[in-house]
């Protein structure tokens, strides 16, 4: 009798994707983040589903419903802490996954890469609307500041902002629709993730050397299922340590105060995972210019495949590009730090220089480094 996993219509798809999938024999732990992101998504959907059973999306009761979840619901405090810190773990894995893609040239699988960028934008949108739901001070003012950026769009800006708000300011209608968005978007993310995998399995995985691995492949199970299991264990352990011992360390103290439209916090800032983009937004004094820079900071990822000039795919054997990559990483950490600081000197100038360096590295220096490395590899005799 033929093995059921190879003949059953549904099992066959799972088999080709996770069991008999030919995978390069040399992929490192940097290739673990795909499965970790899948695990993060499942955790967020499950914890979010149970939280939604007790949450009320009304401006009068939203804040107290979150307090009720933490105090009165069985293990509600754990659900809330896992969900809030799960978002941080999700973004940490996302940033490392994107970084891996840039370092090893995975962006040359253009369809997979472009779907990945759309996924990143969708996850960011989901996290933003989710941050508003507890209806604390930072939730309300974060929503006000970020949605107000839409009004910078010429002609239609104000109308668009009011359309998103469902009124003339962030209020009950805004909270209700943000809850609806926050509930539906994870399912859209799941669908996009399946498409992402579909495109990846058309080409097969890249590997650290950047060389075609077809001559040396091994089955995904048991080799990489065991490897993924180790990664998942470390992810769950980190998440549990964070959620149980330091659940509020990545949040904002202002969010423990209920939203008050009459009292502006001294320093409005989003979640830590948005701070690099927020710093780029603030580094330009003009409102529309800032919004365009904010969009460009993420959408620039879409043109990275077009900026690849090197003859080698991976940065593994390209020391100049490696150096620039780690400067870019340090620069993004600097931007994240600046985004959390008040708008005063010397933070303003540091933010402006770091923002300029971010675009300079991606658009000019890294493509030039690729060309220079090609020249250095040419025989000179």
From Swiss-Prot:
It comes from the Eukaryota. It is a multi-pass membrane protein. Pfam families: Cytochrom_B_C, Cytochrome_B. Binds 2 heme b groups non-covalently. It is found in: Mitochondrion inner membrane. The lineage of its organism: Eukaryota, Metazoa, Chordata, Craniata, Vertebrata. The keyword Repeat does not apply. Heme b b566 binds at residues 97, 196. GO terms for cellular component: mitochondrial inner membrane; respiratory chain complex III. Its cofactor is heme b. This is Cytochrome b. Keywords: Electron transport, Heme, Iron, Membrane, Metal-binding, Mitochondrion, Mitochondrion inner membrane, Respiratory chain, Transmembrane, Transmembrane helix, Transport, Ubiquinone. The chain crosses the membrane at residues 33-53, 77-98, 113-133, 178-198, 226-246, 288-308, 320-340, 347-367. Heme 1 (or BL or b562) is low-potential and absorbs at about 562 nm, and heme 2 (or BH or b566) is high-potential and absorbs at about 566 nm. The cytochrome bc1 complex contains 11 subunits: 3 respiratory subunits (MT-CYB, CYC1 and UQCRFS1), 2 core proteins (UQCRC1 and UQCRC2) and 6 low-molecular weight proteins (UQCRH/QCR6, UQCRB/QCR7, UQCRQ/QCR8, UQCR10/QCR9, UQCR11/QCR10 and a cleavage product of UQCRFS1). This cytochrome bc1 complex then forms a dimer. The gene is MT-CYB. InterPro entries: Cyt_b/b6_C (IPR005798), Cyt_b/b6_C_sf (IPR036150), Cyt_b/b6_N (IPR005797), Cytb/b6-like_sf (IPR027387), Cytochrome_b (IPR030689), Cytochrome_b_C_euk/bac (IPR048260), Cytochrome_b_N_euk/bac (IPR048259), Di-haem_cyt_TM (IPR016174). Component of the ubiquinol-cytochrome c reductase complex (complex III or cytochrome b-c1 complex) that is part of the mitochondrial respiratory chain. The b-c1 complex mediates electron transfer from ubiquinol to cytochrome c. Contributes to the generation of a proton gradient across the mitochondrial membrane that is then used for ATP synthesis. One of its GO terms (biological process) is mitochondrial electron transport, ubiquinol to cytochrome c. The keyword Membrane applies. Its main location: mitochondrion. Heme b b562 binds at residues 83, 182. A ubiquinone binds at residue 201. Disulfide bonds: none annotated. It comes from Antechinus minimus.
